[in-house]
From Swiss-Prot:
GO terms for biological process: endosome organization; protein localization. InterPro entries: Alsin_GEFs/MotNeuronReg (IPR051984), DBL_dom_sf (IPR035899), MORN (IPR003409), VPS9 (IPR003123), VPS9_dom_sf (IPR037191). This is ALS2 C-terminal-like protein. Residues 795-941 form the VPS9 domain. Acts as a guanine nucleotide exchange factor (GEF) for Rab5 GTPase. Regulates the ALS2-mediated endosome dynamics. Homodimer. Forms a heteromeric complex with ALS2. Interacts with ALS2 and RAB5A. It is found in: Cytoplasm. One of its GO terms (cellular component) is cytoplasmic vesicle. GO terms for molecular function: GTPase activator activity; identical protein binding; small GTPase binding. SUPFAM superfamilies: DBL homology domain (DH-domain), Histone H3 K4-specific methyltransferase SET7/9 N-terminal domain, VPS9 domain. Expressed in heart, lung, liver and kidney. Keywords: Cytoplasm, GTPase activation, Repeat. MORN repeats lie at residues 358-380, 381-403, 409-431, 432-454, 459-481, 483-505, 506-528, 529-552.
């Protein structure tokens, strides 16, 4: 059954609905018609505010009608409609929102004095309506102007209505049992409308105070500050403060900004970017803003408390966008604004950030966290900031003078400058991938021009303070040459080796980008010059030429006017031919560039990573990252994105990596782990290996594929294996430290065993292509002789070849030969020792020397097995029997470039095999290789009693 309170609510809503309708028709509609098409800005603003008030009044009337309808249904049909169906209870937030919108629109008009300004345009009409306006007021009378009466008529009915709402709801609550279904709804409505009553009184007071403020300001200040949305919260004329260092005459705290007045000038601070910090003195309050730090000094601590409380609450209100203040001293819990915020701001003060707009996270008035910084000239920086400076990963876009050209920096930053690893794509189409320090290239890095550049180049090496310095490789594609050596101040300086596309290479000392003093020049025809010469390889000054045939020319050289070469010296034609190892196989760079110090710029960041304890958030900064080139995207600001692993992912993955590493310490498990790690581009070891591969390719591939660099390359691969093992040990040490354990010391013998036996086989495939090419070039002559010998021996049928090689007949595997009816043993070809031959052919399918030696051992086993089967008993081959049989198998296997294979095995094999079976078999294979090259393997050296027809 409905109560008397519900009936009172119904009557209250009926009265308020009628009052609202009369207010709309008597006041708001005539106000809109007073000047429907104003021409001045002030008139247009007043019309906009009145239209907004009219719309909010109509919405409030509509909500009141809905509430009235729900009350009628409740009173006239109580069994079917419970109390909880009443709109005022079931949807109290909706009702509250309509009231809030009306209050906002009304106070905007009060602040802008819209009623007074518009009413003056139809003053006669409004004077005639004074009596009707007074009837809307509860007292029935009103003193003051028409504008004042109008304000009261629009405000008083609402204030009284909300007050009566609250009283009736309180009375209704008392009539309900605690278990009543609507009890909770009633309590919620009481809370909402209690807050509304407080808010309304505060909002009206603020609007009146703000309206009064405009009269106390000069016209210039009023034009700057006057806004319908402004609400004055505190004035220093009420509670005086002394401001330093700006020396403001007056301080105004609005709901969205803090304003300092200095004569006709204003300093306005957005409250979203204001931080409040109490001073040590109880009368001092510090205000932090993006570009100013100011202090308020009050006369007494009470004044400081008021200012601190009001500024703090104003900041909270600005951040949450709600004008909902508790009354000072009401006992409500004071809100505390967050230290970290996300706001946009444009810097004004002269300096690096002048006119730049920062949009992102802040902390204590400084950009801090993720954000975007944009300048009017088109510069952009997207990334992380720390205490106001770029810090961490960021992408910076810098426009060039030419249209649609940008420099794009994808780098790590520290204290506002590029630091550690980054990728920079310049408007010139050059790309730099490497390390920085203090905004300059520093450490290891690769700078490469666009392929279509007029003078294409690529530099791979070390930098110091933005200049090439230390060991580095530069490829000049226009000249077709590659420089391998030392640099200083962006110039070739110190020892260096130059390799040309034509196959010529020379070594000397450079100073100021030019050769200084004598050098060594090796030509493609294996002639050697020792002396002074120019960069274009013109012999100049004293020197000595050693020709391939052994002749020497010692004297002085100069160039003639007709581009000829003039010399004055001694030609010695009686000299013996030089040792091939002194000219054709002469190696450059050995001892000149100690292998331990060549790529310190690659190893150093990894060591720093280990020294810091392998922090995941520092992995890509120290070890690098890879992104797709955005050369096309750089033409627009769309390139402010980067395809790289998320830094948060690196933190977790690094911890997992260290844990996994501890689980794979046994030999077999360790081998599997290292194979997986080295093939993973995100694993620290995999990242290091990929960088080392880049340096190796930059040095020895393409133009650098020169036989005179073979030893330099093979010692570099071994050094990389040693460094990678040290890197693994470093990771293991950190992983153990995380577990509170220590890593046992490792002696040199154990280290060498692990490097050659474990790690070198795993990394050699990464360098094999370039390394084996150097072996091919170095042993090209011997392999040519060997190839001709193989061709000659292939003319023999099997039995003739066995006979020619002096293989004892009782060892011939004739039982393995299956002849057709018209075949003879003497005609069979490529059938004897077939399993051994097929086994040896697999040597070219393997990479590591250990695997190649295992193939050789299996081949030896197949030869012995075949002989044992022929003899019908187990038979161990003596060297006298083995060599002819091995020559036979080698000739039938027809392995190309066997010399390169043998020397690679010899140079890269594990020292543990020295003196063992593998060493013995490799020596035997070398003997076969050398024997096949001999003159007696040529057709004209075959036994005279052999007719060529007999070979078939």
């Amino acid at each position: 059954m409905s109560s008397s309170e519900e009936a009172d609510l119904l009557r209250l809503e009926e009265v308020f609905s009628t009052t609202l309708a009369r207010t709309i028709s008597l006041i708001l509609q005539p106000l809109l018609l007073a000047d429907p098409e104003p021409s001045d800005p002030c008139g247009k603003e007043c019309l906009r505010l009145l239209q907004q008030l009219h719309e909010s009044a109509q919405r409030l009337w509509y909500v009141t009608e809905q509430s009235l309808l729900s009350l009628r249904q409740r009173l006239y049909h109580p069994p079917s409609k419970g109390l909880e169906a009443v709109l005022l209870l079931s949807n109290a937030d909706h009702v509250l929102q309509a009231h809030m919108e009306y209050i906002k629109s009304y106070t905007d008009c009060v602040v802008a004095q819209a009623f007074q300004k518009v009413s003056k345009k139809r003053s006669e009409f409004w004077r005639s309506q004074r009596k009707a306006l007074r009837q809307l007021l509860s007292s029935g009378s009103s003193e003051g102007s028409v504008g004042t009466t109008m304000c009261q008529a629009l405000r008083q009915p609402l204030s009284q209505h909300v007050q009566k709402y609250l009283l009736l709801l309180l009375s209704l609550r008392d009539t309900l049992d605690e278990s009543h279904p609507a009890q909770e709804l009633v309590m919620h409505a009481i809370t909402l409308f209690g807050n509304l009553q407080s808010f309304m009184g505060q909002a009206l007071d603020q609007a009146v105070a703000t309206q009064a403020l405009w009269h106390s300001l000069s016209s210039r200040l009023r034009d700057v500050l006057c806004s319908p949305a402004h609400r004055l919260l505190q004035d220093s004329q009420d509670i005086p403060v002394v401001v330093t260092p700006l020396r403001a005459e007056r301080v105004l705290l609005f709901d969205d900004s803090l304003v300092l007045l200095q004569g006709h000038n204003t300093h306005t601070f957005d409250l979203k970017l204001v931080w409040v910090k109490p001073g040590q003195d109880k009368c001092v309050l510090h205000i932090l803003t993006p570009e100013e730090e100011i202090s308020f000094c009050t006369r007494d601590p009470q004044g400081q408390v008021v200012w601190q409380w009001k500024v703090t609450q104003a900041v909270c209100q600005a951040l949450c966008g709600k004008k909902d203040f508790p009354v000072l001293g009401s006992g409500r819990e004071t809100s505390v604004p967050p230290e970290c915020r996300c706001v946009a701001y444009t810097f004004c003060r002269e300096g690096r950030l002048c006119q730049a707009t920062y949009d992102g996270e802040w902390c204590r008035a400084k950009p801090h966290g993720k954000g975007t910084l944009k300048w009017p000239d088109g510069r952009n920086h997207v990334g992380t900031f720390y205490q106001g400076l770029e810090h961490g990963f960021g992408i910076c876009l810098v426009p060039q003078a030419s249209e649609d050209k940008f420099d794009c920096y994808k780098c790590h930053w520290r204290e506002g400058r590029m630091c550690e690893y980054g990728i920079c794509e310049y408007g010139t189409d050059e790309v730099y991938k490497g390390y920085f320090q203090a905004g300059l290239r520093h450490g290891f890095g690769i700078l490469e021009s666009a392929p279509q550049a007029p003078q294409p180049f690529r530099y791979t090496g070390h930098w110091e303070r933005g200049q090439r310095s230390g060991y580095g490789i530069e490829e000049d594609r226009d000249r077709g040459e590659r420089y391998i050596g030392m640099w200083q101040a962006d110039q070739r300086h110190g020892p260096g080796v130059v390799v040309t596309q034509a196959g010529v290479c020379y070594q000397g000392t450079f100073q100021g980008d030019k050769m200084a003093g004598p050098g060594i020049l090796l030509c493609e025809d294996d002639s050697l010059y020792e002396g002074t010469f120019t960069r274009d390889l013109t012999l100049l000054g004293k020197g000595k030429v050693t020709f391939p045939n052994g002749f020497t020319l010692d004297g002085s050289f100069s160039s003639g006017t007709d581009k000829g070469l003039y010399t004055q010296g001694v030609l010695d034609t009686a000299a013996l031919p030089p040792d091939p190892s002194s000219t054709r196989k002469r190696q450059l760079g050995l001892g000149t560039f100690p292998v331990e110090s060549r790529w310190q710029g690659v190893y150093s960041p990894f060591r720093d990573f280990l020294r810091l304890g392998c922090p995941g958030e520092q992995q890509e900064a120290l070890l690098g990252f890879h992104t797709q080139s955005s050369r096309e995207l750089r033409k627009s600001q769309e390139c402010l994105c980067c395809e790289r692993s998320h830094p948060e992912d690196c933190v977790g993955s690094m911890e997992d990596t260290l844990k996994e590493l501890l689980q794979h310490r046994k030999p077999k498990a360790l081998q599997q782990y290292l194979r997986k790690a080295l093939s993973n581009s995100r694993h620290p070891l995999g990242q290091l290996l990929r960088t080392l591969m880049l340096t190796f390719q930059a040095t020895y591939s393409g133009i650098g594929a020169n036989k005179h660099l073979q030893e330099m390359a093979q010692e570099e691969v071994k050094q990389h294996a040693r460094e990678l093992w040290a890197a693994y040990r470093g990771l293991l040490k950190v992983a153990l430290q995380h577990q509170g354990q220590t890593l046992e010391e490792e002696n040199m013998e154990t280290r060498d065993l692990q490097v050659h036996g474990l790690l070198l086989p795993l990394i050699l495939p990464s360098f094999y292509s370039e390394l084996f090419t150097l072996y091919l070039l170095l042993h090209e002559r011997e392999d040519g002789l060997y190839s001709r010998g193989i061709t000659n021996l292939s003319l023999f049928p099997d039995t003739k070849l066995l006979e020619f090689l002096d293989v004892q007949k009782h060892l011939w595997p004739l039982k393995d030969l299956k002849l057709t009816s018209n075949q003879r043993y003497s005609l069979v070809r490529d059938k004897c020792f077939l399993t051994a031959t097929e086994c040896l052919q697999k040597i070219i399918t393997t990479v590591h020397p250990r695997e190649k030696l295992e193939v050789l051992e299996k081949t030896y086993g197949e030869i012995e097995a075949t002989v044992s089967r022929v003899l019908g008993c187990k038979y161990k081959l003596p060297m006298d029997d083995l060599l002819p049989l091995l020559i036979y198998v080698v000739s039938r296997a027809r392995i190309q470039h066997l010399g390169a294979e043998i020397h690679l095995i010899r140079d890269m094999m594990d020292p543990v095999h020295t003196g063992g079976l593998h060493d013995f078999l490799l020596t035997a294979l070398e003997s076969c290789y050398e024997h096949i090259q001999k003159e007696d393997m040529r057709p004209h050296h075959l036994p005279g009693h052999w007719d060529a027809r007999d070979l078939w």
